[in-house]
Amino acid sequence: MATADHQELLGGLIRLHVLHHAAEGELYGHWMIEELRRHGYRVSPGTLYPMLHAMERRGYLKSKVQGAGRRARRMYRATKKGRDALAFAKSRVRELFGELIEGR
């Protein structure tokens, strides 16, 4: 099965990937699409941008527009709530991946 067939299942991992980078510094949508592609995810703008907007509405990200006109970019950064959620998720992911990889 292709990655697109697993998109719903991978959505949580993609959100964690976004939070990870947004906690390290600012990011924008096109950069994030390329970053995800480097990790084997095929995410379209029609998938990523609604995800970013939803994460912002839920308080995990905050954004600001940099530049003007055609060069304007919406830059995203993790909020305290987003960084806290990422820390919590990391502990859960470590536990889960330990089970998946080691078969515990």
Model-derived features: positions:
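The DNA-recognition helices of helix-turn-helix-type DNA-binding domains
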Residues: 39, 55, 93
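N-terminal helix-turn-helix DNA-binding core of bacterial DNA-binding proteins
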Residues: 3-47
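Basic amphipathic alpha-helical segments that dock to polyanions
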Residues: 48-50, 54-55
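Amphipathic alpha-helical dimerization/coiled-coil segments
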Residues: 86-104
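Beta-hairpin "wing" of winged helix-turn-helix
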Residues: 58-72, 77
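Basic, amphipathic "hinge/linker" alpha-helix immediately C-terminal to the N-terminal HTH DNA-binding motif
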Residues: 72-89
